Amino acid sequence: MKFSDIETISHGVSDYLADNKIVDMTEIQRQTYKHIMDNRDIIACSSTGTGKTLAYLIPIINRLRRDTHNIQAVVLVPTAELAIQVNNTLKDIFAHMDNTLTSAALIGDVNISRQIDSI
């Protein structure tokens, strides 16, 4: 299945995928997309480099409202390195959008005031 087959995908996400030459969905992305869009909880497992981050970020982004400044999603990850990676991916995707969405990585053992200010 190709990302272009998804009718609900936002233009910004489509632009990000095109710029990164990502055309086909990976197995983990195909298996999880509809469940996440249907607001269902999932537990999925896949090897490194199979597209897990985009498997959950793309449907989350497609569900976000652009007319509010409230926190709409929280992604909880087990390590600071993964938090930074996920946040960088979000920032890359948001750069292809209308600048109404923002993200921040909040990491333990780091100055919380500065992190809160980044939200």
Question: Where are each of the predicted segments found?
Answer:
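Walker A/P-loop NTP-binding motif
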Residues: 30-42, 53-68, 89-94
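Conserved nucleic-acid-binding Ia/Ib motif block in the N-terminal RecA-like helicase ATPase lobe
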Residues: 8, 12-16, 69-119
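Nucleotide phosphate-binding site architecture
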Residues: 23, 61, 65, 83, ...
